[in-house]
């Protein structure tokens, strides 16, 4: 769900402003408004007014930068969900990745290209004759900030534009998008640590809290690069797994000719704390799944002479998936149908196992060597939902859109 203040629409793209944006605008206005040289030039009120104007022009430049990314993405048929301005600049929320490294490069370079164009434009405006001195100052500052915005964003590390360009280059060279993301994310983490180090050195050298600004930006880059890396690792791990890798044989095969009374007496009363899965079989063939819900639909007076075969649901009529299918197909099916469990079938349509969300998380953790306790797995099974930080349904959607 999108957060922040919706302030309008540009080219059918919703524009949002985060609460942190107001803080940075006020801070920039204060710094410019309290500058003695400005106060001397245009007075206190004029200094504050021009400071506010500079802040608006700065974020207008950021908005145009993000709009550059967005319009190129739209030209490739990619939906742009929103553009948001916040403390550290702006971000365009794009529905999916570009299909090719060349298209990914085009989306990435568009933002810095807009910033360079704005730098040239404001530089030329500043050379016009007859402009007031304060106008020349503001125009010059906006020109410089656009140049800085372009150059900073070209640093080759995610989530910066340069990281996206680096990712596209590695993707092109290796024919692997995940390899490109991995390299660019690692580069972004290096950049993030560099920013943090620079900020701390600046702070201790100057004693000014403004020296910490590079550290805050570095922390932002580090966290986002880490998020890219984690998401890439999860996607890569998921695409290597088959449904059979997650299926478990936690079910019982019963004689299809067993009476419903015998079934109820021998199995339903033995363990009320678990929810076992039952399949009916006869003559070496599976006849279907037997559920408590179907048993309850039968009058108790009929239990003596009705058999499991009479209430068994054929395997191809219950939620099922082939063991040869990618695990991502099972994840998508569970989410789309809001199912608790799937029956996994062999190519001959026999039962290979069952799987639920807990089994999927266990298989993924094993694939990626992630430590996860059985208690967490059982909690996922009971709740029928993935943990908050591991929304595999959304991750699979991202894989399929890539």
Place the predicted regions along the sequence by residue.
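N-terminal signal-anchor transmembrane helix
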Residues: 1-48, 93, 340, 359-402
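Small-residue-rich helix-interface/hinge motifs
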Residues: 2-29, 48-104, 141-145, 149-169
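Membrane interface segments of multi-pass transport proteins and intramembrane proteases
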Residues: 9, 13, 125-139, 168-184
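Alpha-helical transmembrane segments and adjacent TM-loop junctions that form the membrane-embedded core
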Residues: 144-234, 273
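Membrane-interfacial segments at transmembrane helix termini in multi-pass membrane proteins
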Residues: 205-256, 368-392
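Bateman (tandem CBS) regulatory domains
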Residues: 239-252, 262, 305-318
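The conserved cystathionine-beta-synthase
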Residues: 254-274, 280-282, 299, 319-340, ...
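Short hydrophobic beta-strand motif reused across regulatory alpha/beta modules
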Residues: 287-295, 352-361
């Amino acid at each position: 769900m999108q957060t922040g203040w919706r302030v309008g629409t540009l080219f059918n793209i919703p524009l949002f402003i985060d609460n942190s944006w107001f803080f940075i605008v006020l801070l920039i206005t204060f710094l410019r408004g309290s500058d003695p040289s400005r106060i001397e030039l245009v007075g206190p009120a004029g200094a504050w007014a021009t400071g506010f104007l500079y802040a608006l022009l700065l974020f207008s430049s950021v908005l145009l930068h993000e709009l550059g990314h967005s319009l190129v993405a739209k030209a490739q048929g990619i939906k742009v969900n929103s553009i948001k301005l916040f403390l550290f600049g702006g971000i365009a929320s794009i529905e999916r990745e570009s299909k090719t490294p060349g298209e990914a490069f085009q989306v990435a370079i568009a933002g810095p290209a807009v910033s360079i164009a704005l730098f040239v434009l404001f530089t030329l405006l500043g050379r016009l004759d007859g402009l007031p001195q304060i106008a020349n100052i503001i125009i010059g500052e906006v020109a410089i900030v656009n140049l800085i915005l372009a150059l900073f964003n070209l640093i080759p590390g995610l989530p910066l534009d340069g990281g996206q360009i680096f990712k596209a280059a590695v993707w092109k060279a290796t024919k692997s998008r995940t390899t490109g993301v991995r390299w660019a994310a690692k580069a972004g983490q290096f950049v993030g640590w560099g920013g943090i180090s620079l900020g701390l050195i600046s702070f201790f050298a100057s004693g000014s809290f403004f020296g910490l600004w590079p550290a805050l930006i570095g922390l932002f880059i580090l966290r986002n690069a880490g998020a890219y890396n984690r998401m890439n690792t999860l996607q890569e791990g998921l695409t290597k797994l088959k449904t059979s890798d997650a299926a478990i044989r936690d079910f019982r095969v019963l004689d299809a000719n067993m009476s419903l009374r015998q079934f109820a007496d021998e199995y339903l009363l033995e363990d009320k704390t678990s929810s076992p899965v039952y399949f009916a079989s006869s003559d070496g063939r599976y006849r279907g799944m037997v559920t408590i819900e179907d048993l309850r639909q039968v009058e108790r007076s009929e239990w003596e002479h009705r058999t499991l075969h009479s209430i068994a649901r054929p395997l191809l009529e219950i939620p099922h998936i082939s063991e040869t299918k990618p695990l991502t197909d099972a994840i998508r099916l569970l989410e789309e149908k809001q199912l608790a469990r799937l029956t996994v079938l062999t190519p001959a349509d026999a039962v290979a196992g069952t799987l639920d969300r807990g089994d999927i998380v266990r298989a993924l953790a094993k694939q990626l060597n992630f430590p996860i306790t059985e208690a967490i797995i059982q909690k996922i099974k009971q709740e029928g939902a993935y943990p908050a930080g591991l929304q595999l349904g959304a991750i699979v959607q991202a894989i399929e859109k890539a």
